[in-house]
């Protein structure tokens, strides 16, 4: 199953890895494919997720050239018949090994940055709490396209650090403007956080949605059902459930907080 999914995006994947190798090869330690491509299967709007590990920081010339070339290998969901959205996260080996929280991210590329990149705005290296979640994902489910397996290269992320990252993520969503235009993703992400808080594991979005559905009061189930169906390619109508959506967000945040604290 996993090999078949990867085969469907092999051409694009080869192009992306080729760009990475061309710009980073002297310092490149590893490239790991993680996310939907290797866990649960690519859905209509799924990204191709890559974690790249290098030995040294990127100079500004390399950063800009790499990002500009990655832009040519990626497309926003629904805008291309042959290209998927690509998300590339780059870390420096000594910033994450040995593990410490929060860890530093050297670079991240994604379609949400396209307009900024075209305007000449490039995100610098930064502390990223999400690396605790990302590295947990990579250690659980990934394929090494370059270098050793993720579970061999990366230290395990302690559960308390994973919980801290999950808890910090909850602060992003407090009122409707925080999820306007991104309703589906927020609903599914909250379901995944809830799943991870309870189980200590990372699940595909649709699997986490099914898990959450079984635990939700009946009045919130239509919200997650709409999000799941939209994720699988049906029409996204979540914006029409504004009141239910707000109640859902606050309910699930409350359930997560019971587990992870604060």
Curated annotation (Swiss-Prot):
Domain of life from the UniProt record: Bacteria
Recorded catalytic activity of this chain's protein: streptomycin + ATP = 3''-O-adenylylstreptomycin + diphosphate; spectinomycin + ATP = 9-O-adenylylspectinomycin + diphosphate
Protein name: Aminoglycoside (3'') (9) adenylyltransferase
NCBIfam families per record: ANT_3pp_AadA1 (NF033126), ANT_3pp_I (NF012157), PRK13746.1 (NF010309)
Function description: Mediates bacterial resistance to the antibiotics streptomycin and spectinomycin.
Effect of residue 8 to E: In plasmid pBP201
Organism: Klebsiella pneumoniae
Entry-linked InterPro entries: AadA/Aad9, AadA_C, NT_sf, Polymerase_NTP_transf_dom
CDD domains: NT_KNTase_like
